[in-house]
Amino acid sequence: ITLNDVQSILTNYGVPGKVFNINLYKRAFIHRSYTKRPALENTKENIIIEDCPDDCLQLKQKSNERLEFLGDGVLECITKYYLYRRFPKENEGFMTEKKIALVKNESIGKLAYEMGLHKWYIISKHAEEKKIRTNLKKLGCLFESFLGALFLDFNKISIEDEDKWFKDVFVTGPGFQIAQIFVEKIFEQHIDWTALIKNDDNYKNILQVKVQKQFKITPDYLEISHDPDEGYRMGVYICLGQTIHGLEH
């Protein structure tokens, strides 16, 4: 991704097109499949590293996962505050449901795709074959990484005042406020709020409420299997009053 690309994304969503550290944004687009692996790990798995072709990027040292971790927290806080202001008469249960609907990976992955972020995703050939570039869960991670980069980049700004109050009180700069403007503009441009309010597709929550109401118990959830790229693959089993052994899915 280029400086002009980043500036265009920022200005499209109400943020000044000023980039202080382009490398943060470049890092945000590096999937872990395109990073260098430890030599010992390659030897153990009999992986032979070929020379990089002239028309390919060199493998990167670090992926976007630390930025994703940061962006996830920033997005969570911004979304909660946005819902708190948008729905002043709703209770915390309603806001929690809508927050889950907004920030789940598939939802923000859809936003990332509509924004065109997938075009700059740096992934391996194997990941490309597994259609990671259009995998909404992975694009959700990409969105969070970009947001983490934006947050850090605008924290580079120092705010001075005569009494040095900003310097003594705030650990960060205005990165959160800039991220807030960015996310809220995206919500306003891409989210169908009428559909979001009417629909409740949190099927796990619907089932749990019914089970708790009728049987006075809370279900236990068991992870069936997990693929690092594809995510969770879960069979659905309901067990009331007895243990299930030897599950297949």
Which residue stretches match the model-derived regions?
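Double-stranded RNA-binding/processing signature
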Residues: I1-H249
